[in-house]
């Protein structure tokens, strides 16, 4: 039956009652009411005041809170004798909720219930088997009215669910006029009787006779101010939805009564919720035999290395399950010893690893602190007095340790100098010429190829086409110089401007790495100035102009110091015909920026800007000395592959330690003297060769 079917011409009406029960109690006469139903969607429930209840009732029983129950107007009642036959559960003190008392337009009159007879009890006990397996109430209600109900007198059973519980009430009527009622809680029941005659209603409460009448009397007398206000609004209740005031009332009920559930004989939720969580955790840890956690998270921070190994926290020595045979004493002792040995070994490993991490952290902090102090020294003492201090011993020692990145570009510019007197305006002119050349190449690139071979400047400018190919291979791991990268246009501009500035040199493979390192530390114009002056050095000019005679002279000078510092490895290379040009060309062309890690290459650049080309060959000897033991066991192919592809994780301190042991002095001659003597011999051989042939 739906709410919309309720009307004055229909026989279906609604009944709201409060069901309650108590062992040994009985209900005598309840009111047989004729009522007028109000549509449920427009009714507002009215609740009575809070009542004080007896202390003899159990405190741990189920409770529920109903909301949204329709309000009924009750007419003149007719006495209906009802009796409680069999009750199997106990009632709690808070289970009788006065706010859920039956509310109507007029108060319920008190009735004097009569005690049930013995025959009724016996019959009820004999027939009351609706729900025999549970601890809920099984109740028989007798309603011997003047009209007997036939089989056509059906009962519509509604399942009533409250806000806080999932409870139901089931009623059935047979032709014997016996009403079986099975109640799972003190939730309200809505029953609709379909009969041809006037409907008769029964309000049933499963509580004692005395307390039932007391509830109705107290409900009518002890009424609060809020309840009276709700009664005044009763005629207008159909203008509101039933949930408008019911939610407020139920929220107030929840605050007044902190309900608890008794589940499986455990402590009710009310007592558990009020318990301190820290106290509960402590009791659990004491029972489990585990140490309690410190109250503050700061106490979890280890202040030393004496700690439990993290790898063994999940490894717990436990006995066998109860359903398996117990371990023998010898086996259990053996397993315990093995477990303790595992824990000891894990502690040792983690202690060693922690010490290693601690050492690395200390070294890192020390390096950062030294860099910070060096920055102050460079900015406050050295750079303001560059001309007088750059060659002092203090500055040289500080220089060897590495220039801080924040001042590296400035120091490089001062150390390289500007002997070519290149200005920013000259860079703009060369860049504009390079862009014009790119446009001409895009429209008619065959002009350069058709020009006379004697115009070397035009041929060198044609090397602009090669720049695009080489830029994509510059520091590919960084992904900042490739097409679309943040430094692609800057690198392209510097290399293009240089080809126009020095058409006799043009672009040579390897220049892109040098320009890229300068861009990372300098602005575009300053990087172009440093790049042009750096390539103007004798060694770089010899290599980038591919002067074979001068290049061989540099290789010969290198081998002199190679034999002086590493005679064993030098002999091994001679035996395998591994010449210096196989690995030195790549190192010198790119100034180690391609062969070594970038941070290590920048540190080599620091000293190179101070000491010049000599340090480039000294660095090569330092690398050979660092891997001397490995190279002496390799043949030609493996040695060449190793030197052209050095390890990527070279420690800078180890490399510089090896470089510091290299002596750039042979037979009391330094690098410049040896190189000058070799150049003189080379010129004499070239001049004397024709006379020899004559």
Swiss-Prot record:
<protein>
    <recommendedName>
        <fullName>TBC1 domain family member 14</fullName>
    </recommendedName>
</protein>
<dbReference type="GO" id="GO:0019901">
    <property type="term" value="F:protein kinase binding"/>
</dbReference>
<dbReference type="GO" id="GO:0005794">
    <property type="term" value="C:Golgi apparatus"/>
</dbReference>
<feature type="modified residue" description="Phosphoserine">
    <location>
        <position position="92"/>
    </location>
</feature>
<dbReference type="Pfam" id="PF00566">
    <property type="entry name" value="RabGAP-TBC"/>
</dbReference>
<feature type="domain" description="Rab-GAP TBC">
    <location>
        <begin position="402"/>
        <end position="612"/>
    </location>
</feature>
<feature type="region of interest" description="Disordered">
    <location>
        <begin position="108"/>
        <end position="130"/>
    </location>
</feature>
<dbReference type="GO" id="GO:0071955">
    <property type="term" value="P:recycling endosome to Golgi transport"/>
</dbReference>
<feature type="modified residue" description="Phosphoserine">
    <location>
        <position position="296"/>
    </location>
</feature>
<keyword id="KW-0343">GTPase activation</keyword>
<dbReference type="GO" id="GO:0005776">
    <property type="term" value="C:autophagosome"/>
</dbReference>
<dbReference type="InterPro" id="IPR035969">
    <property type="entry name" value="Rab-GAP_TBC_sf"/>
</dbReference>
<dbReference type="InterPro" id="IPR050302">
    <property type="entry name" value="Rab_GAP_TBC_domain"/>
</dbReference>
<comment type="subunit">
    <text>Interacts with ULK1. May interact with RAB11A and RAB11B, but does not exhibit any GTPase-activating activity toward these proteins. Interacts with TRAPPC8.</text>
</comment>
<keyword id="KW-0333">Golgi apparatus</keyword>
<keyword id="KW-0597">Phosphoprotein</keyword>
<feature type="region of interest" description="Disordered">
    <location>
        <begin position="272"/>
        <end position="305"/>
    </location>
</feature>
<dbReference type="InterPro" id="IPR000195">
    <property type="entry name" value="Rab-GAP-TBC_dom"/>
</dbReference>
<dbReference type="GO" id="GO:0010507">
    <property type="term" value="P:negative regulation of autophagy"/>
</dbReference>
<dbReference type="GO" id="GO:0005096">
    <property type="term" value="F:GTPase activator activity"/>
</dbReference>
<comment type="function">
    <text>Plays a role in the regulation of starvation-induced autophagosome formation. Together with the TRAPPIII complex, regulates a constitutive trafficking step from peripheral recycling endosomes to the early Golgi, maintaining the cycling pool of ATG9 required for initiation of autophagy.</text>
</comment>
<dbReference type="GO" id="GO:2000785">
    <property type="term" value="P:regulation of autophagosome assembly"/>
</dbReference>
<dbReference type="GO" id="GO:0005829">
    <property type="term" value="C:cytosol"/>
</dbReference>
<feature type="compositionally biased region" description="Basic and acidic residues">
    <location>
        <begin position="272"/>
        <end position="289"/>
    </location>
</feature>
<dbReference type="GO" id="GO:0055037">
    <property type="term" value="C:recycling endosome"/>
</dbReference>
């Amino acid at each position: 039956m739906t709410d919309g079917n309720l009307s004055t011409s229909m026989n279906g009406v609604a009944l709201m009652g409060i069901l309650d029960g108590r062992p040994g109690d009985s209900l005598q006469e309840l009111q047989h009411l004729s009522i007028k139903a109000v549509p449920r969607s427009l009714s507002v429930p009215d609740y009575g005041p809070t009542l004080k209840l007896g202390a003899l009732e159990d405190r741990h029983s189920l409770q529920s809170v109903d909301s949204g129950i329709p309000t009924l107007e009750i007419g003149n009642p007719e006495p209906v004798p009802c009796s409680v036959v069999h009750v199997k559960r106990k009632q709690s003190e808070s289970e009788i909720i006065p706010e859920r008392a039956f509310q109507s337009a007029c108060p319920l009159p008190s009735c004097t219930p009569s005690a049930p007879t013995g025959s009724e009890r016996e019959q009820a006990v004999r027939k009351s088997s609706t729900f025999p397996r549970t601890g809920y109430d099984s109740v028989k209600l007798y309603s011997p009215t003047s009209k007997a109900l036939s089989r056509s007198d059906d009962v519509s059973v509604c399942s009533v669910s409250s806000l806080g519980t999932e409870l139901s009430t089931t009623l059935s009527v047979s032709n014997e006029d016996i009403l079986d009622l099975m109640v799972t809680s003190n939730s309200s029941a809505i029953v609709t009787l379909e009969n041809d005659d006037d409907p008769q209603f029964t309000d049933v409460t499963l509580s004692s006779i005395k307390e039932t009448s007391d509830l109705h009397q107290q409900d009518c007398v002890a009424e609060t101010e809020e309840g009276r206000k709700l009664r005044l609004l009763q005629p207008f209740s159909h203008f509101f939805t039933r949930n408008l005031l019911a939610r407020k009332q139920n929220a107030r009920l929840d605050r007044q009564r902190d309900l608890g559930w008794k589940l499986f004989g455990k402590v009710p939720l009310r007592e558990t919720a009020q318990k301190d969580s820290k106290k509960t955790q402590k009791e659990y840890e004491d029972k489990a035999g585990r140490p309690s956690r410190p109250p503050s998270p700061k106490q979890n921070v280890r202040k030393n290395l004496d700690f439990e190994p993290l790898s063994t926290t999940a490894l717990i020595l436990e006995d066998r399950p109860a359903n398996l045979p117990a371990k023998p004493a010898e086996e259990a002792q053996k397993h315990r010893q093995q477990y303790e040995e595992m824990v000891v070994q894990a502690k040792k490993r983690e202690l060693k690893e922690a010490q290693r991490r601690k050492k690395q952290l200390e070294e890192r902090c020390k390096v950062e602190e030294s860099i910070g102090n060096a920055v102050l020294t460079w900015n406050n003492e050295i750079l303001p007095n560059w001309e007088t201090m750059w060659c002092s011993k203090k500055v040289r020692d500080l220089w060897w340790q590495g220039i801080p990145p924040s001042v590296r570009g400035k120091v490089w510019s001062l150390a390289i100098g500007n002997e070519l007197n290149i200005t920013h305006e000259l860079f703009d002119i060369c860049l504009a010429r390079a862009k014009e050349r790119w446009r001409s190449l895009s429209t008619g690139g065959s002009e350069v190829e058709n020009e006379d071979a004697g115009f070397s400047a035009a041929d060198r400018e044609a090397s602009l086409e090669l720049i695009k190919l080489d830029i994509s291979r510059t520091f590919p791991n960084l992904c900042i110089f490739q097409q679309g990268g943040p430094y692609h246009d800057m690198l392209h501009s510097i290399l293009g401007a240089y080809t126009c500035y020095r058409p006799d040199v043009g672009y040579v493979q390897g220049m892109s790495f040098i320009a890229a390192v300068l861009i990372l530390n300098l602005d575009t114009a300053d990087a172009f100035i440093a790049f042009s002056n750096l390539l103007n050095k004798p060694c770089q000019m010899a290599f980038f102009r591919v002067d074979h005679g001068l290049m061989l002279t540099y290789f010969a000078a290198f081998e002199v110091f190679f034999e002086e510092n590493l005679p064993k490895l030098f002999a091994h290379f001679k035996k395998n015909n591994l010449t210096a040009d196989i690995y030195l060309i790549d190192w010198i062309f790119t100034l180690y920026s391609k062969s070594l890690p970038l941070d290590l290459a920048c540190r080599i650049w620091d000293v190179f800007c101070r000491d010049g080309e000599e340090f480039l060959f000294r660095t090569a000897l330092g690398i050979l000395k660092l891997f001397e033991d490995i190279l002496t066991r390799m043949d030609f192919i493996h040695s060449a592959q190793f030197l052209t592809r050095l390890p990527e994780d070279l420690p800078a301190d180890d490399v510089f330690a090896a470089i510091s042991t290299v002596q750039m002095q042979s037979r009391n001659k330094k690098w410049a003297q040896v190189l000058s003597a070799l150049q003189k011999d080379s010129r004499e051989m070239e001049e004397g060769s024709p006379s020899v042939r004559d």
